């Protein structure tokens, strides 16, 4: 049984009218703004004076302008943002990518190799996850075929060391929620950005979508459980500071019977 976590994991507090939340000097959260479909969080990485900033994920359709505006309001020059690094390419994470690219000409797209090929080929099965959801979203948002075809500038692989913004982040391939899911890990500070593989409150990502795999998700959770994590920055919902030892392991153990 899950234990109540309020006050235990010390969630980073946020106001509903505040989109940008400072995690540290070189790391900010741009909060998702959920609608009928969830809008993923976006993270801004890099030392402010480096001129080499990165966004982790983009978010839902129609949210790009507001996210760029929130960056400007915080004093960030969009031209200093050099790349978008995707934790995975589901719709709620990649939906407004083209909007962001329109605001920041020349920005690069970095995606794990398992999802880069389909993205470049216009194979949107991973983006939508299931056919029924695709039909609903195309009708709701007037999305055309090929709307999520992109050129990928860098194909990420497990173990890559990303030296960006005056810092270093390790790429961990954590499939299961999606084929090309990745986490970014700052080992020195114990900061983990796991996309939708694990959340607060002992929750994990779905494993019933296209290219999802429950056994792979189980292995990915087990792998993450072996990391030293002090701050957990998921793709949705609460972000967590002062994560107790064993939190990810307990989450993995709780879900293991459903993932085997």
Per-region residue spans from a language model:
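Metallo-beta-lactamase
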Residues: 60-62, 161, 168-255, 259
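Conserved beta-strand hairpin/beta-sheet module of binuclear metal-dependent hydrolase folds
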Residues: 20-74, 183-195
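Short catalytic-loop micro-motif centered on adjacent basic/acidic residues
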Residues: 29, 54-57, 83-85, 171-173
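N-terminal amphipathic/basic-hydrophobic helices that include classical n-h-c signal peptides
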Residues: 1-18
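Active-site HxH/HxHxD metal-binding segment of metal-dependent hydrolases
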Residues: 60-65, 72-160, 251-257
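Short Pro/Gly-enriched beta-strand edge/turn motifs at strand-loop
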Residues: 23-30, 140-145, 165-167
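Residue-level marker for buried hydrophobic side chains located in beta-strands
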Residues: 54-56, 85, 109, 191-193, ...
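Divalent metal-coordination and catalytic microenvironments
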Residues: 26, 45, 57, 88, ...
């Amino acid at each position: 049984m899950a234990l109540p976590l309020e006050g235990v994991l010390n969630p980073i507090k946020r106001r509903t009218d505040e989109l940008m939340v400072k995690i540290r000097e070189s790391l900010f959260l741009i909060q998702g703004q959920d609608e009928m479909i969830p809008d993923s969080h976006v993270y801004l990485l890099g030392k402010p004076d480096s001129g080499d900033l990165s966004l982790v994920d983009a978010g839902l359709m129609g949210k790009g302008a507001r996210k760029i505006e929130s960056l400007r309001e915080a004093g960030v020059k969009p031209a200093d943002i050099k790349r978008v690094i995707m934790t995975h390419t589901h719709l709620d994470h990649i939906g407004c990518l083209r909007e962001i690219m329109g605001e920041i000409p020349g920005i690069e797209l970095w995606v794990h190799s398992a999802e880069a090929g389909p993205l470049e080929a216009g194979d949107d099965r991973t983006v939508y996850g299931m056919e029924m959801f695709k039909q609903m979203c195309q009708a709701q948002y007037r999305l055309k075929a090929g709307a999520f075809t992109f050129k990928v500038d860098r194909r990420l692989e497990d173990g890559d060391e990303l030296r960006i913004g005056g810092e270093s982040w390790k790429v961990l391939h954590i499939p299961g929620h999606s084929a090309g899911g990745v986490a970014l890990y700052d080992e020195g500070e114990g900061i983990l950005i796991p996309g939708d593989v694990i959340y607060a409150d002992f929750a994990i990502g779905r494993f019933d979508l296209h290219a999802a795999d429950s056994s792979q998700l189980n292995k990915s959770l087990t792998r993450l459980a072996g990391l030293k994590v002090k701050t957990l920055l998921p793709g949705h919902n609460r972000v967590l500071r002062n994560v107790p030892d064993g939190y990810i392991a307990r989450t993995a153990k709780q879900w293991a019977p459903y993932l085997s």
